[in-house]
């Protein structure tokens, strides 16, 4: 069995390997399932693991300032957050339509938290995100303009 685990690891099927270990550790739970059903569970676990690893890689690359999630948004304070709008934004339609979001508000109103939460959500949907403060983005564009590489910088992200 160790040889099989080594092969699965070499093939980078670690989710499949771990799910197989789980199935073998709990034979009563999976014993009544047929071969195709068990194989389907193993491949589904591998796909889930890959999606999770991709999302974590995208989140790490985005360099978010905060580890924020939409589920942690505080609607109690008078911040003017519309639950229906946030729910709509969380579905990611604005991403598929290639629309932008501009967050404005007073200092401490939660703009950074909301931006990071929407970015995390987009990463979990498989989108590449990069978190920029406006000042840093403008400085990079200005430097790119001086070096005539602004377009390349923006296309990269």
PLM region descriptions:
Residues 5, 9, 13-66:
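Interdomain "pre-motor" coupling segment immediately N-terminal to P-loop NTPase/helicase cores
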Residues 100:
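Walker A (P-loop) ATP-phosphate-binding motif of ABC ATPase nucleotide-binding domains
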């Amino acid at each position: 069995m160790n040889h099989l685990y080594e092969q699965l690891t070499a093939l980078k099927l670690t989710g499949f390997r771990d799910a197989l270990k789980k199935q073998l550790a709990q034979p009563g739970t999976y014993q009544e399932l047929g071969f195709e059903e068990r194989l389907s569970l193993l491949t589904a676990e591998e796909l889930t693991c890959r999606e999770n690893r991709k999302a974590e890689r995208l989140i790490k690359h985005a360099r978010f300032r905060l580890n924020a999630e939409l589920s942690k948004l505080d609607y109690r304070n008078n911040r003017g957050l519309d639950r229906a709008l946030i729910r709509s934004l969380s579905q990611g339609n604005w991403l598929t339509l290639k629309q932008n979001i501009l967050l404005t508000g007073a200092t401490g109103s939660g703009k950074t938290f909301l931006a990071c939460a929407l970015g995390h959500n987009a990463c979990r949907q498989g989108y590449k995100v990069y978190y920029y403060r406006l000042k840093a983005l403008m400085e990079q564009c200005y430097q790119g303009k001086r070096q005539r590489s602004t377009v390349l910088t923006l296309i990269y992200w």
